[in-house]
Amino acid sequence: MPFMDKQGVTQMPDLLRWRILACLAPALSFAALQADDAGGWTHYGGSQRGMQYSALDQISRENVATLEEHWRFRTGEMGQNANHPFAFQANPILVENRLYISTGTAIVIALDPSSGREIWRYDPQIDRAINYAEVANRGVSSWIDAAAERGAPCRHRIFVGTLDARLIALDGTNGKPCADFGDNGEIHLDRGVRTERGEWVVYTITSPPVIVNGVLVTGSAIGDNQK
């Protein structure tokens, strides 16, 4: 926040100024170094910058009106036994010729992008009887171990966060949890976090994590005005 001196002139403390610059520098460097994945959609929002843009030009303003539906897929997730309405908000990603989506309850599904055929499905089995502050999941993240041989278990990993604050790693090939990640494929992020477990669960994960230089970074969602 700005500060004012005795003359009423707005000042910014040196410490705060340097903190802002320190935050901006890596952000600018990251944006300068990262290029959109030409022809792909390997991250939430299309690229590591989340620009929601593709350089492909096969579909344009001139021909978009002539497109026809090729296939349609239904997740089957209708919020059965849930105490709170939820919405489908996922942004699919396309990696190694597979389409990955997630439902509002963090069920992860891998599809054949050519036919819409379901290849595998993973259900984290969240407790649907609980009132979550927000019932949504906006997608998954993908990471490929460049040092692993092609075909090795969990060479390609799909990460998803859950409403009960778990971070789960799945084998992109078959959807099985990666046993070497956390506790048999999952980490409970709410352990050690002081939250009041009352009528509502206020600490959840609704957005996909970000992976930068081999480091997995995840945020969280909290429920407002629930107390």
Kindly give the residue locations of the regions a language model identified.
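Aromatic (tryptophan-biased) beta-strands that constitute blades/sheets of beta-rich domains
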Residues: 36-83, 117-128, 176-198
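Bacterial N-terminal signal peptides that target proteins for export
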Residues: 5-22
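Blade-loop segments of beta-propeller domains
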Residues: 75-93, 104-106, 110-147, 191, ...
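Hydrophobic/aromatic beta-strand positions that recur at structurally equivalent sites within the blades
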Residues: 59-62, 111, 170
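Residue-level recognition of short loop/turn positions
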Residues: 66, 96-98, 105, 114-115, ...
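Repeat-blade elements of multi-bladed beta-propeller folds
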Residues: 41-45, 85-105, 132-166, 201-226
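Flexible loop/turn segments at secondary-structure boundaries
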Residues: 50-51, 108-109, 129, 168, ...
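Bacterial N-terminal signal peptides
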Residues: 19-31
